[in-house]
Amino acid sequence: MFKHLRPVWAEINLDNLASNMKHIKELSNTKEIIGIVKADAYGHGALDIVPTLIENGATALAVAVVSEGVELRRGGIECPIMVLGFTPPSLIDMLLKHDIEQTVFSLDYAKELSKAAEKMHKVAKIHIAVDTGMGRIGFLPNEQSIQDVKAISMLPNIKIKGMFSHFSTADEKNKEYSAYQLNQFNKFYEGLKRENVNIETRHISNSAAIMDLPETIFEGVRPGIILYGYYPSNEVDKTKLELKPVMQLKTNVVHIKKIPSGEYISYGRKFKTDRESLIATLPVGYADGYTRLLFGKAKVIINGQLAPVVGRICMDQCMVDITDIKGDIKVGEEVILIGEKNGVKIDADDIAEMLGTINYEVICMISKRVPRVYIKNGEVIKVRNYI
C-alpha cells in the first residue's frame, strides 16, 4: 500500500477516535476527562492521537511512567499530564521540569518531592492514590493515612490536585465489590474534609465505571480502553456507549505458491497439508505483536473472506491457506489481521478470546516495528514509522 513502508501497518482511524471521545464526554458529563494514553496510547501512538482527544473533550492526560509524559511535552502537548504509577526519586527533577503531575502514596515520598520542588523553585502537583481494594499502590483508607495526607498538604511547594483510586471489578456484572471500594473512597474523602484538606478533583471512574456506575463520576473520570473503541468486558452495559474500534492491523501478500498434499508448513512440522494447497506468505510475525500463541486458531480477512493461518507463526512471517478463497488472489493483495471488511471481522476481542486474554493486551502488543498510518475523513494524513 505504501511505497516507503514495509508491507505491514496499523491504520489508526482518527474519526472513530473522535466519535468515541465525544460519546464518552456526553455520557460522563463532568468537569475533568483524563484520557489514559499510557503504553503509547494502548499501541495507537500517543503523540499522534492526543490532539484528537483534546479537540473532542479530553481535558487532561494520564500516563504510566514519567518518560511517557516527557515525550508528550516534547511533542508540544500543553494540557495537564499525570503519572499514574511510581516515579523514582532520581527522576523527580524530570517531573518538575516538564510540569508533570505525580501520584503520591507515601508521606516520605511527598517530602522528597517537596524538597526537590523547593530547590528548583517549582510547585509539585500531586494526586493522592488510595488503595480501596486493588492491593496495588495507594494509601490504605485509615486514620493514619488521613493524617499523612494532611501532613503532605502542609508541605512547602506541594499542591494536591486530586485524589483517586482504581476499581478492580467494575467491569463485572456483580457490582458489590465496586460498591465497597466506592464506600472506602468516600469515607477517606470525608476524613480529609474533616481535616480541612482540599481536594480539587476526585477520580475513580475507569472505563467500566463510566458506563455502569454513574454514582462514581465525581469531578473527573479516566476513560481508557473505551477511547480506542473496545468495551472493558462483555459484562458491561454496551447500550450506554456507542464505540468504534480505532485500530486495524493490515499487511500484503508477498508470496503465493501451490504446496502438494503431505507437505509441512513452518517450524516444528506442526501443520501438514491434507490436499494440494494454495499458500500465501505474509510478512508479519510475533516480533510485530502477532503472537505465535495464535497457532491453530488465527484467521485473516482476504478478499472479504476468512482464511486460516497455518503452521507456527514465525518471528517475521506467517503463512495462510487461501485454497478456498474466491477470487484471483495475487501478490500485493491486502490482508486484514485485525479489523473488518464488508461485514467480515476479526477484532481484538476475537483474538483475545482465542488467546484467553483481554482486548487491552492484544492492541498493546502491536510493536513499534509496525508503522502507524493515521486516517481522517478517509484519507491518510500522517504516517509514523518508528524505525
From Swiss-Prot:
InterPro entries associated with the record: Ala_racemase, Ala_racemase/Decarboxylase_C, Ala_racemase_C, Ala_racemase_N, Ala_racemase_pyridoxalP-BS, PLP-binding_barrel
- Cofactor requirement: pyridoxal 5'-phosphate
Could you name the domain of life of the organism this protein comes from?
A: Bacteria
Q: Does the UniProt entry include the keyword Cell inner membrane? A: no
* Cited CDD domains: PLPDE_III_AR (cd00430)
GO cellular component, alphabetical, reads:
cytosol
Cite the EC number: 5.1.1.1
Which BP terms does GO give this entry? D-alanine biosynthetic process; peptidoglycan biosynthetic process
What keywords is this UniProt entry annotated with? Isomerase, Pyridoxal phosphate
Q: Which PROSITE patterns match?
A: ALANINE_RACEMASE (PS00395)
- Which residues are modified to N6-(pyridoxal phosphate)lysine? K38
A Pfam family the protein falls into: Ala_racemase_C
SUPFAM superfamilies linked: Alanine racemase C-terminal domain-like, PLP-binding barrel
GO molecular function terms attached to this record: alanine racemase activity; pyridoxal phosphate binding
Q: Which reaction does it catalyse?
A: L-alanine = D-alanine
Q: Which residues bind substrate?
A: R136, M315
Q: In the UniProt record, does the keyword Isomerase occur?
A: yes
Cite the annotated pathway. Answer: Amino-acid biosynthesis; D-alanine biosynthesis; D-alanine from L-alanine: step 1/1
> What residues make up the catalytic site?
K38 (proton acceptor), Y267 (proton acceptor)
* Alphabetical list of PANTHER family matching this protein: ALANINE RACEMASE, ALANINE RACEMASE, CATABOLIC-RELATED
What is the annotated role of this protein in its UniProt record? Answer: Catalyzes the interconversion of L-alanine and D-alanine. May also act on other amino acids.
Stated family: Belongs to the alanine racemase family.
Name of the molecule in the record: Alanine racemase
